[in-house]
Amino acid sequence: MSGYGMSVNDTTIWWQVYPLGFTGAPIRPSNEGERALTPRLDAIIPWLDYLIDMGANGLLLGPVFASETHGYDTVDYYRIDSRLGDDAAFDRLIDACRSRGIRVMLDGVFNHVGRSFPAFRDALAGHGHESMFHITRNAGGGVDYRRFEGHPELPELNHDSEEVVRLVTDGMLH
């Protein structure tokens, strides 16, 4: 078909890596805070040549943003999970991919967040951001919310909310 170029997905063979598991990160972030950073993302770099040897030319990274446990319970879309390192570690991985001609795709978890997500905590307390979630309050003061696949630690985002549209857009452009 003339006039139509091939898309990235037509020309990319992806190798998927779940960084928290692949790098042996602890199940939960350290209580010691940011000072305890270990640049575990660096452990992926030596595997990039293997990716190419397998015939792949794209790295699909599972969740890399700050989360409470498994990466799919995001608490901050603008910070690399401290168990994986920091922005500098992420930049080194991206630079190593670029130098080898490897495309990178991130797994953006925008269907739900973790219970410690600041806007969710505010919404539960009645301090704003309620429209971002499917929250119901009963007459007795109880609060309920829609959960991803029934998991209470994964509050669903309300994609009809303008705040959520901005959150997702800003997160993808960050």
Language-model segments: what does each one mean?
Residues G3-W14, Y18-N57, V64-H174:
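Substrate-binding/active-site clefts of carbohydrate-active enzymes
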